[in-house]
Amino acid sequence: WIMGHMVNAIAQIDEFVNLGANSIETDVSFDSSANPEYTYHGIPCDCGRTCTKWEHFNEFLKGLRKATTPGDSKYHEKLVLVVFDLKTGSLYDNQASDAGKKLAKSLLQNYWNNGNNGGRAYIVLSIPNLAHYKLITGFKEALTSEGHPELMDKVGYDFSGNDDIGDVANAYKKAGVTGHVWQSDGITNCLLRGLDRVRKAVANRDSSNGYINKVYYWTVDKRQSTRDALDAGVDGIMTNYPDVIADVLNESAYKAKFRIASYDDNPWETFKN
């Protein structure tokens, strides 16, 4: 999965997919009542990027729905996965469940079209703080009470705080999550970060009793760091330059081993060689 980083304006969906992304990451900010409000990152952000592009969250979802609904004039067949980077740092811990419920209702109405031929992309809820695990249970409760528990089949999870892998496993246990787990590791492109924790996550993914299904690394903008991440065995790379990742995947060393994921590749299944 080539994951376009910080896609917060509707116009950027086309831009990143046309550069080779089959997945995008979008920032979600919340108001003081735990309503998802804007797709907005803010300053500071990655080096070389504009930090302040934004939409109202529900408007972004409508644009995203068009981009992922077959038959729509804005449809992109290859856009198959969306990571919502949930900026829950502005919330109190006890608001996490409410944030999950409100997020689910927004998605149900504006992205899934109340279950009637909505957008088809898989969705990853990426949460920065392990203490906010109730966002997951709230999300699930809301979809169930709205009569659409089947949409949970399209939803996966990520804790993005680079926490100890044992602590992450524990948070999932508390949230009642068994599967659909993406594990991120990374840092802003302005700084360097080694691959030690990525290798631990990959080892967990490939063990018989691990909790991780997929591992992605962020934010990778250079050819050599792309090669290093692929050599470590990641499933996804988040980038500001999807064309750079696509170029490296075309190199003979990687062409035989990796391919770009399509809609038929289940993002919740651990890949077995």
Swiss-Prot record:
Tissue expression remark: Expressed by the venom gland.
Glycosylation sites: N250
Residues that bind Mg(2+): E25, D27, D85
Gene3D superfamilies in the cross-refs: Phosphatidylinositol (PI) phosphodiesterase (3.20.20.190)
GO cellular component term, pick one: extracellular region
A GO molecular-function annotation: metal ion binding
Family annotation (Pfam families): GDPD_2
GO biological process: killing of cells of another organism; lipid catabolic process
Compartment annotation: Secreted
Stretch forming the signal peptide: none
Catalytic residues in the record: H5, H41 (nucleophile)
CDD domains with a match to the protein in the record: GDPD_like_SMaseD_PLD
Domain of life: Eukaryota
Alphabetical keyword list: Cytolysis, Dermonecrotic toxin, Disulfide bond, Glycoprotein, Hemolysis, Lipid degradation, Lipid metabolism, Lyase, Magnesium, Metal-binding, Secreted, Toxin
Principal place of residence: secreted
CC cofactor note: Binds 1 Mg(2+) ion per subunit.
Disulfide pattern: C45-C51, C47-C190
Reaction catalysed by this enzyme: an N-(acyl)-sphingosylphosphocholine = an N-(acyl)-sphingosyl-1,3-cyclic phosphate + choline; an N-(acyl)-sphingosylphosphoethanolamine = an N-(acyl)-sphingosyl-1,3-cyclic phosphate + ethanolamine; a 1-acyl-sn-glycero-3-phosphocholine = a 1-acyl-sn-glycero-2,3-cyclic phosphate + choline; a 1-acyl-sn-glycero-3-phosphoethanolamine = a 1-acyl-sn-glycero-2,3-cyclic phosphate + ethanolamine
Enzyme class label: lyase
EC number: 4.6.1.-
Functional description taken from the UniProt entry: Dermonecrotic toxins cleave the phosphodiester linkage between the phosphate and headgroup of certain phospholipids (sphingolipid and lysolipid substrates), forming an alcohol (often choline) and a cyclic phosphate. This toxin acts on sphingomyelin (SM). It may also act on ceramide phosphoethanolamine (CPE), lysophosphatidylcholine (LPC) and lysophosphatidylethanolamine (LPE), but not on lysophosphatidylserine (LPS), and lysophosphatidylglycerol (LPG). It acts by transphosphatidylation, releasing exclusively cyclic phosphate products as second products.
Name of the protein: Dermonecrotic toxin LapSicTox-alphaIB1b2
Species: Loxosceles apachea (Apache recluse spider)
